[in-house]
């Protein structure tokens, strides 16, 4: 089978998130953890992008002029605020329901986002390219991590960045991110994450580096119960984020 004939889409995952699509923008609904997670990942993205492209992170629209892909965008929780920072955003998701919810919310909020019900493979085959690709909380839901990451990396322009965030495959993550979050605290519906599909940092880095990109930064992220918010941490045993850069053209 040729690479172009393969797919990174896990239809059972698409169906699971499509069934919850109406709750994307409810801060107390099934996507509450992502609403809580948004501030720390947005700050991380903004600061790192601005550092790379020589922008002022405190500017009103610091990402003005940059083309950004939010792959696996869901209902648009990340796409919208990134667009508000001035970026030209393409939000892609294989779920028609997710894209419908995202498009409606953006229109009602007066935010311009180019939402498309497409896969990473379809975008790459169409010759799309981006200054920044956001691959956030997605790899643990795809059918082929290496192919997915490689496909995304091919669309990063010279000098551009790719961000990734996911959950580590450790016993600590199994206890906290799956058992506690889904069965005890009920923050997420049961079955949202499967332990065997979680991705270790080195497993995520391998296809990124093989695609000609350099890992520039890694960080753990932890939830502070007392503060009721997520913070960056050196501990990558559960949640973590990383940023990679494609070398600038000679």
Curated annotation (Swiss-Prot):
Do you know which InterPro entries this protein is assigned to? Answer: Methyltransf_11, SAM-dependent_MTases_sf, UbiG_MeTrfase
Tell whether Cytoplasm is among the UniProt keywords. no
Biological process terms from the Gene Ontology for this record are:
methylation
Residue ranges crossing the lipid bilayer per the database entry: none
Q: What is its EC number?
A: 2.1.1.222, 2.1.1.64
Q: In what pathway does it function?
A: Cofactor biosynthesis; ubiquinone biosynthesis
Alphabetical UniProt keywords: Methyltransferase, S-adenosyl-L-methionine, Transferase, Ubiquinone biosynthesis
Residues that bind S-adenosyl-L-methionine, according to the entry? 41, 72, 93, 136
Can you state which reaction this protein catalyses? a 3-demethylubiquinol + S-adenosyl-L-methionine = a ubiquinol + S-adenosyl-L-homocysteine + H(+); a 3-(all-trans-polyprenyl)benzene-1,2-diol + S-adenosyl-L-methionine = a 2-methoxy-6-(all-trans-polyprenyl)phenol + S-adenosyl-L-homocysteine + H(+)
* Gene Ontology MF: a single term: 3-demethylubiquinol 3-O-methyltransferase activity
Q: What class of enzyme is it?
A: transferase
What family is this protein classified in? Belongs to the methyltransferase superfamily. UbiG/COQ3 family.
What role does this protein play?
Answer: O-methyltransferase that catalyzes the 2 O-methylation steps in the ubiquinone biosynthetic pathway.
* Cross-referenced NCBIfam families: UbiG (TIGR01983)
Q: PANTHER family from the xrefs?
A: METHYLTRANSFERASE, UBIQUINONE BIOSYNTHESIS O-METHYLTRANSFERASE, MITOCHONDRIAL
Q: What is this protein called?
A: Ubiquinone biosynthesis O-methyltransferase
Query: Highest lineage ranks of the organism?
Result: Bacteria, Pseudomonadati, Pseudomonadota, Alphaproteobacteria, Hyphomicrobiales
């Amino acid at each position: 089978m040729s690479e172009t004939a393969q797919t990174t889409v896990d239809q059972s995952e698409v169906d699971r998130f499509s069934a919850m699509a109406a709750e994307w923008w409810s801060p107390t609904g099934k996507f509450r953890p992502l609403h809580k997670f948004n501030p720390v990942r947005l700050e991380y993205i903004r600061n790192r992008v601005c550092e790379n492209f020589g922008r002022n992170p405190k500017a009103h629209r610091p990402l003005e002029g940059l083309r950004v892909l939010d792959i696996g965008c869901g209902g648009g929780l990340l796409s919208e605020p990134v667009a508000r920072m001035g970026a030209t955003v393409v939000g892609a998701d294989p779920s028609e329901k997710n894209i419908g919810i995202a498009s409606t919310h953006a229109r009602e909020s007066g935010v311009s986002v180019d939402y498309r019900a497409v896969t990473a493979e379809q975008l790459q085959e169409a010759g799309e390219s981006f200054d920044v690709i956001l691959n956030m909380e997605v790899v643990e839901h795809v059918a082929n991590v290496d192919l997915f990451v490689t496909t995304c990396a091919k669309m990063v322009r010279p000098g551009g960045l790719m961000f990734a965030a996911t959950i580590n495959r450790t016993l600590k993550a199994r206890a906290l991110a799956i058992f506690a979050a889904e069965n005890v605290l009920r923050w997420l519906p049961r079955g949202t994450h499967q332990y065997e599909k979680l991705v270790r940092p080195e497993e995520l880095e391998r296809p990124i580096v093989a695609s000609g990109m350099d890992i520039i930064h890694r960080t753990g992220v932890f939830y502070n119960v007392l503060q009721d918010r997520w913070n960056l941490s050196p501990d990558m045993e559960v949640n973590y984020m990383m940023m990679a850069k494609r070398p600038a053209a000679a």
